[in-house]
Design a protein with these regions (language model features):
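Conserved acetyl-CoA-binding loop of GNAT-fold acetyltransferases
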Residues: 121-132
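A short beta-loop-alpha structural element at the N-terminal edge
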Residues: 1-9
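Conserved GNAT acetyl-CoA-binding A-motif
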Residues: 93, 100-112
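Conserved beta-strand in the GNAT
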Residues: 42, 48-57, 73-78
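Conserved acetyl-CoA pyrophosphate-binding loop and the N-cap/start of the following alpha-helix
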Residues: 83, 87-95
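Conserved acetyl-CoA binding element of GNAT-fold acetyltransferases
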Residues: 65-81
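Active-site rim helix/loop that mediates acceptor-substrate recognition in acyltransferases
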Residues: 18-44, 54, 60-61
Length: 146
């Protein structure tokens, strides 16, 4: 199974929408357009992809008196229901955090589902200072100050 096909299968499971005939091609084109700033990890059990997560690189606009910075946005984290609670999500998250640290990102940001907030908080993510109480934006690293 190619990585693109595996991502397509997982995306279909995640959204609970059957794949349409052109979906894999649209996904391949999207992945190609994003490849300079997005990395996607796949978790496999044997030959079956059971999880995925993406890390997108955001490049901050330069500003006088401040060095340029980059930060990561974690997205598309998904583990098949039958493969949950086996450490797969934790392994994907550890890989994302390690990559963000290696790339020297100023911060790692995500917007999790309500059900996943505790999972990310256990990994060191927190609501940024000044965020509204209902927001689910979580940050690991420096704050989101302008």
């Amino acid at each position: 199974v190619s990585p693109t096909r595996a991502i397509a299968q997982l995306r279909s499971l995640w959204t609970n929408v059957p794949s349409d005939p052109e979906f894999e091609q649209r996904l391949a084109e999207w992945l190609a357009a994003e490849e300079d700033r997005r990395t996607t990890w796949l978790a496999w059990l044997g030959s079956q992809a059971v999880g995925m997560a993406s890390l997108f690189e955001y490049r901050r606009m330069p500003r006088p008196g401040r060095s340029d910075s980059r930060w990561g946005y974690l997205s598309n984290m998904f583990v098949c229901e039958e493969s949950r609670n086996q450490g797969i999500g934790s392994a994907l998250l550890a890989a994302i955090i390690a990559a963000a640290d290696k790339r020297d990102y100023a911060r790692l940001v995500l917007s999790p589902s309500e059900a996943a907030v505790a999972f990310y908080k256990r990994a060191g993510f927190a609501v940024p200072d000044g965020a509204a109480g209902g927001d689910r934006l979580l940050v690991r690293g420096e704050s989101l100050a302008p």
